[in-house]
């Protein structure tokens, strides 16, 4: 009898374990399906979602996707999706319903349009942060949005919402941050909890909102009388104008379509500046001839898409040719939130930062809300394009002396920023996409100091995990814990660049040719994870780019690889070397090449000065 009970208990325990395991597997698959369907439901012209590659069976692999944060790194359960400023298009993606544990959704500063789903509360019932600002969403704000009872933050500003605000919004007891400014809303503002004390600007620039904190609403009879008068006048006016409007659009239609086709996608902002062409460009070198915005427009053919050199988190870089034939690079900053006065002050500071291994900032221009920076042109473009070209058939790999020269020069420039520049600068965006090369393959670092000019960083985990101000694959792991930028974070990012130079692999993914097979094998992870695996197996030599081997410099290559490992493998940031130490190690390896001139880097004090740089020009 006792034996029978024991067998039953064991059977029941096994059944419960199998049931739990099955539910976990189903939940993982639902989250994977959520992101896969989400990706298919939106347009991604800038290919920021290219890291969303499915089919990997590794636990937690979707947690490495750009903009995605998981509850735990070793399980496919999505905590938040943050895709602000990705340039995505489409309607509100209903696929988010499959991410059942989602608590944060940020689709701000994209090109989403159309109405919000009426059943939005059933799609994201547990979300605490919902940011849909700076899009083109339209229609009425759904009444059922008030059923997302855990909402702490609701940002709907800068859209095209119409109608009235649902009075049920006042029932959101946890709401602390809220804005509906710059829409087309009318009617009374809900009677929010008085302790919230929402400011007027959170409701500003709508058609006719009223009630606290705005002006009191008028009486119903007065409103009805006003409506009658407006309707009568509007009817007479409409009757007189309707024929003219129809004819106007009839004759304009073909021209508008043709103009849209001729207008390269992405430069409408430039055409809107035609009335600002007389705006002067501030140049740091007084010897340079005076320039105006019209000169920049002409040099870039009104910032045509064909002249784009690269697009990144800080903005888009264009190639420009002046009338005298000289070339320069012009960066359009992405959503700088600084006032013109603050921006001028920052530019004056950055304009004084000069070093052989930094891209010289020649000048800047402010026109309306646009911020344009002028840089010296670099003939060999970005290091990323030299290592990972789009056309691999005509690709000629960089030889080892060129790669070592790039490594030493970049290390020297970054060490100067950390240890000798006044003010000291933490870059925060080091990658092969911010290292430009001259005609002689002399490296120059760009984007230094730009993090402070971008949108203020929030404290959300995904900001750091996914590199809001750092390219995906280069961000030091401690950001997800400390949420503080440090020089050792730059050291980690530079270590990844060194790995790219030695291996020829991309930071975000690895493609290696098997020694046993002639086919390609894909390692399921990023470059640092691959190096970590090879290091644990004592197989680091397998990581080296084969085009570099057998030329009598194998010892130098392996030494640089070891320096890179010292930068990226320690889990504790303090165990990494300083940039000054990294530079000294690389300089010693390349001593026979005579790459570097006299040092202009101050030797750090023994007090650890390099670890505690005052962040004068970094993101707040």
Curated annotation (Swiss-Prot):
**Keyword Iron-sulfur belongs to the record:** no
Q: Which GO terms describe its cellular component?
A: plasma membrane; plasmodesma
Its transmembrane ranges are 229-249
According to the UniProt topology, which residue ranges lie Extracellular? 28-228
Where Phosphothreonine occurs, residue numbers? 300, 463, 482
Q: Where are the LRR repeats?
A: 101-124, 126-148, 150-172, 174-196
Give an example GO biological process.
defense response to bacterium
List of residues binding ATP: 309-317, 331
> Which residues are modified to Phosphotyrosine?
479
GO molecular function list: ATP binding; identical protein binding; kinase activity; protein kinase activity; receptor serine/threonine kinase binding
Its name, as the record gives it, is Probably inactive leucine-rich repeat receptor-like protein kinase At5g48380
Which residues are reported to be glycosylated?
Answer: 56, 111, 119, 147, 193
The entry's family comment says: Belongs to the protein kinase superfamily. Ser/Thr protein kinase family.
Subcellular location field: Cell membrane
Q: Where in this chain does the record put each Protein kinase domain?
A: 303-596
What PROSITE patterns is this protein classified in? PROTEIN_KINASE_DOM (PS50011)
Signal peptide residue numbers = 1-27
